């Protein structure tokens, strides 16, 4: 079967939920037996989001093969079974960087390098390459139609539609249909103008997804269809819902998947969304609730911890519990004290970079350890737990990470200086290395030690989890810390790097160097988060008595 392409654009305003809409459509098509993948094209000039501020851009999602990508790829993986890779996300910066590299190498034989055709050709080549072997490729373009930054991408997709044939392509445009309370009606004019903007660059949308806080009335849908030159059945009303996992059924109920299959002349069975119905049932019928404190550095923007937030919700679904997340700035722990942690059922310390707020995180780990509160540390959350234990239990009173104190006399956490990359080449790092693309990234095997809590939680001897870090446990000082009672429960495949630590005489204290949140999904959850939330409920129950 030849590959079919769905191009997703947004208009009127940003943050309409293009990624969620694209992922929801993909999940329906996948449920119809189609081989689907999703790509995200980001117009910013950064090569990737790896060095962008989490409080501006949100989290960096890491793929199996180690790509640092937009958080929308996390949505994609949570909605469909297909895994994302480096091919599923690229930016203007990456495109320009590659074109300039080819120009320096002489690939263009002295031609004058221009946006058209060189930049647009590079975009088209990457879209085609990323979609090889798929029945349907959904391509989301970041930003809003009318933005200068998006123009090369939109032009490339317009050309691609001509190249592969309009019968193999479909343009899906998300717009805002606002409700004006004083008029008592929704307004379609912004949608009409957004489509007009698309038409001005040569793109006629085939489907309109109309975002609103309420269902779009039939007469307004007819009006949109008439003035935007699309069939009425292709005007889809997408109202605000209480759960993003309700959107696949909402789109299916309006026949969007049928319209797509008809357009591409695909003969495939009806979608079975029973798994999503189970997710929604568990979400709507909890048997209790727990409150988990997330002590982080970027809590002013919850999207900085998007995958962690979702993984906690998934663990709630697994345990039939509502998970309430209380965000606490680790700097506030330093100034206001651990009283901010009172009343929590469990504590989670997520990843982060830099010294700011670290002592607050260390005090948080100490509070959880001393008060027997369930604790889950992720990445930096593991490193600070190790530092705390080394200082206050193992007698290494000057313990720290070389990330925070280069002259630390007891560096229990240090820079990884050498390892093999995915090609088998030895890579070397130093304090002077670039920040971008210089971490241990992607899926790595981890060996779990027999008789540990981690082994019990996972129920397996070997697991695969994704990493994003450049600092690791210093094995030189590890024996003294282990002698004081800390247990290493997970090691890298070569048994050289510490991946998981735990405290045996604590009800539930586990910290991992990797990022388990990146592989959690609403349908399957994740064992580490499921065990953590179950421990939170057990702690809550024991303190009610």
Swiss-Prot record:
Pfam families in alphabetical order: CTP_synth_N, GATase
Q: Where does L-glutamine bind?
A: 352, 380-383, 403, 470
Q: Which residues bind Mg(2+)?
A: 72, 140
Q: Which reaction does it catalyse?
A: UTP + L-glutamine + ATP + H2O = CTP + L-glutamate + ADP + phosphate + 2 H(+); L-glutamine + H2O = L-glutamate + NH4(+); UTP + NH4(+) + ATP = CTP + ADP + phosphate + 2 H(+)
Q: GO BP, one example?
A: pyrimidine nucleobase biosynthetic process
Enzyme superclass (EC): ligase
Residues noted as binding CTP in the record, renumbered to the chain: 14, 147-149, 187-192, 223
The superkingdom listed in its UniProt entry is Bacteria
UniProt KW keywords: ATP-binding, Glutamine amidotransferase, Ligase, Magnesium, Metal-binding, Nucleotide-binding, Pyrimidine biosynthesis
What subunit structure does UniProt give? Homotetramer.
Q: How is its activity regulated?
A: Allosterically activated by GTP, when glutamine is the substrate; GTP has no effect on the reaction when ammonia is the substrate. The allosteric effector GTP functions by stabilizing the protein conformation that binds the tetrahedral intermediate(s) formed during glutamine hydrolysis. Inhibited by the product CTP, via allosteric rather than competitive inhibition.
Under NCBIfam families, the record lists: PRK05380.1, PyrG
Q: Which organism is it from?
A: Actinobacillus pleuropneumoniae serotype 5b (strain L20)
Catalytic positions are: 379, 515, 517
Q: What is this protein called?
A: CTP synthase
Which amino acids does the record list as binding UTP?
A: 14, 187-192, 223
GO molecular function terms attached to this record: ATP binding; CTP synthase activity; glutaminase activity; identical protein binding; metal ion binding
- The record's region (Amidoligase domain) falls at 1-266
Pathway it works in: Pyrimidine metabolism; CTP biosynthesis via de novo pathway; CTP from UDP: step 2/2
Assigned GO CC terms: cytosol
General function of this protein: Catalyzes the ATP-dependent amination of UTP to CTP with either L-glutamine or ammonia as the source of nitrogen. Regulates intracellular CTP levels through interactions with the four ribonucleotide triphosphates.
Record domain Glutamine amidotransferase type-1: where? 291-542
Which gene is this protein's source? pyrG
């Amino acid at each position: 079967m030849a590959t079919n392409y769905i191009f997703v654009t947004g208009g009127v305003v940003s943050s309409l939920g293009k990624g969620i809409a694209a992922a929801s459509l993909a999940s329906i098509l996948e449920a119809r037996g189609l081989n689907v993948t999703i790509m995200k094209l980001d117009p910013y000039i950064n090569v990737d989001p790896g060095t962008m501020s989490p409080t501006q851009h949100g989290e960096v999602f890491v793929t199996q093969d180690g790509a640092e990508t937009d958080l929308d790829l996390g949505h994609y993986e949570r909605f469909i079974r297909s895994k994302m890779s480096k091919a599923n996300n690229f930016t203007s910066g990456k495109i320009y960087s590659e074109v300039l590299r080819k120009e320096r190498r002489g690939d263009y034989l002295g031609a004058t390098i221009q946006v058209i055709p060189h930049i647009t050709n590079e975009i088209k080549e990457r879209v085609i390459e990323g979609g090889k072997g798929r029945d349907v490729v959904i391509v989301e373009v970041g930003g809003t139609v009318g933005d200068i930054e998006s123009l090369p991408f939109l032009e490339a997709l317009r050309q691609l539609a001509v190249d592969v044939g309009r019968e193999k392509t479909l343009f899906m445009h998300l717009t805002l249909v606002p409700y004006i309370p004083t008029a008592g009606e929704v307004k379609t004019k912004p949608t009409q103008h957004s489509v007009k903007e698309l038409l001005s660059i040569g793109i006629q949308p085939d489907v309109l997804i109309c975002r609103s806080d309420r269902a779009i009335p039939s007469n307004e849908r007819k009006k949109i269809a008439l003035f935007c030159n699309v069939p009425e059945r292709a005007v889809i009303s997408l109202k605000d819902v209480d759960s993003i996992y309700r959107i696949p059924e909402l789109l299916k109920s309006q026949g969007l998947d049928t319209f797509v299959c008809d357009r591409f002349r695909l003969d495939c069975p009806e979608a079975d969304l029973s798994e999503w119905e189970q997710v929604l049932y568990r979400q709507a019928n909890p048997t209790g609730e727990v409150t988990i404190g997330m002590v982080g550095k970027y809590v002013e923007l919850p999207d900085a911890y998007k995958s962690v937030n979702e993984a906690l919700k998934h663990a709630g679904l697994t345990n039939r519990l509502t998970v309430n997340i209380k965000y606490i700035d680790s700097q506030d722990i330093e100034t206001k004290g651990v009283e901010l942690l009172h009343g929590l059922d469990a504590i989670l310390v997520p990843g982060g970079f830099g010294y700011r707020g670290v002592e607050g995180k260390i005090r948080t780990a100490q509070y959880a350890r001393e008060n027997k509160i369930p604790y889950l540390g992720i990445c930096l959350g593991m490193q600070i737990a190790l530092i705390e234990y080394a200082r206050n239990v193992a007698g290494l009173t000057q313990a720290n990470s070389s990330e925070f104190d280069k002259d630390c006399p007891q560096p229990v956490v240090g820079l990884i200086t050498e390892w093999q990359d995915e090609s088998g080449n030895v890579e070397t790092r130093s304090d002077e290395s670039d920040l971008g693309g210089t971490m241990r990234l992607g899926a790595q095997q981890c060996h779990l030690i027999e008789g540990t809590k981690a082994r019990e939680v996972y129920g397996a001897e070997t697991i695969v989890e994704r990493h994003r870090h450049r600092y690791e446990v210093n094995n030189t000082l590890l024996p003294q810390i282990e002698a004081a009672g800390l247990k290493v429960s997970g090691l890298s495949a070569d048994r050289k790097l510490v991946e998981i630590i735990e405290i045996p005489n604590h009800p539930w204290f586990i910290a991992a160097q990797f990022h388990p949140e990146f592989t959690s999904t609403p349908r399957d959850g994740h064992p580490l988060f499921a065990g953590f939330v179950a421990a939170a409920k057990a702690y809550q129950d024991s303190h009610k008595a």
